[in-house]
């Protein structure tokens, strides 16, 4: 059983997919539950929001890894979080019956970083898509994103030009790197700072719906006896 605490928002009826939302630094598992209702208002998805494993000193919030400098997570705490999330994701797939290819990983700030990590680690199953608000692809010793084998993973990136915590150049670099590797990327910039811009939510929700539908069609095409 996973050591991570988490919250769940069940789908209405049998889930058509799984959405795992990872919060940012200084927050907890409650933070993105409201985002789930906006992204998936018809409750087609089973939603899970994990709590990061590390407590912040003198703060009620949590974080995923230590930060020597932006863009370069501490390798030990980063690796520990990656393995703990892997255990949770595996547990969720088994319990819900939803497969990785029907799963979307999303998050804000550090949570976006962890979504990239879990989607692009070579030893992990590839999800249907990644929803990254104000994040980056981490540079960490002994970890490299496996992009060559993930070209079917769809990516939505939204970042504020006025972000003073994680500069927009990180998002631009991620989009460029992913596109050059052949991944389909939908990229949005706004005048926002370091937060999820509400103006980007309609596009993110539409992307989520489209990604879910594409994953359904792909699964149908791969199933035995599928028609033309």
Whereabouts are the PLM-identified features?
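Serine-hydrolase catalytic machinery in alpha/beta-hydrolase-like enzymes
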Residues: 1-100
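Conserved alpha/beta-hydrolase "nucleophile elbow" surrounding the catalytic nucleophile
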Residues: 23-25, 103-108, 160
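Short alpha-helix in the alpha/beta-hydrolase fold that links the catalytic acid
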Residues: 32-35, 143-144, 167-177
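Active-site signature of alpha/beta-hydrolase-fold catalytic machinery across serine-
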Residues: 34, 117-121
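Gly/Ala-rich beta-loop-alpha elbow adjacent to hydrolase catalytic centers
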Residues: 107-111, 115
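A conserved short beta-strand
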Residues: 125-137
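Short beta-strand/loop motif that positions the catalytic acidic residue
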Residues: 157-159, 163
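C-terminal catalytic histidine-bearing segment of alpha/beta-hydrolase fold enzymes
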Residues: 169-228
């Amino acid at each position: 059983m996973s050591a991570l605490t988490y919250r769940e928002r069940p789908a209405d009826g049998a889930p058509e997919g799984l959405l795992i939302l990872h919060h940012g630094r200084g927050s907890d598992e409650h933070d993105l539950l409201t985002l789930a209702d906006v992204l998936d208002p018809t409750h087609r998805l089973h939603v899970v929001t994990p709590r990061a494993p590390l407590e912040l000193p003198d703060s009620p919030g949590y974080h995923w890894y230590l930060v020597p400098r932006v863009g370069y997570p501490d390798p030990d705490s980063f690796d520990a979080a990656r393995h703990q999330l892997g255990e949770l994701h595996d547990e969720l797939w088994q319990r819900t019956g939803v497969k990785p290819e029907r799963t979307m990983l999303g998050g804000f700030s550090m949570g976006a970083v962890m979504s990239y990590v879990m989607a692009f680690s070579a030893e992990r199953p590839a999800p249907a898509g990644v929803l990254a608000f104000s994040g980056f692809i981490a540079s960490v010793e002994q970890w490299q994103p496996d992009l060559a084998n993930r070209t079917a993973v769809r990516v939505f990136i939204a970042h504020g030009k006025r972000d003073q915590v994680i500069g927009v150049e990180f998002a631009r670099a991620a989009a460029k790197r992913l596109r050059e590797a052949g991944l389909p990327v939908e990229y949005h910039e706004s005048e926002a700072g370091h937060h999820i811009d509400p103006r980007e939510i309609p596009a993110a929700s539409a992307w989520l719906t489209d990604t879910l539908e594409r994953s359904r069609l792909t699964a149908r095409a791969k199933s035995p006896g599928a028609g033309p």
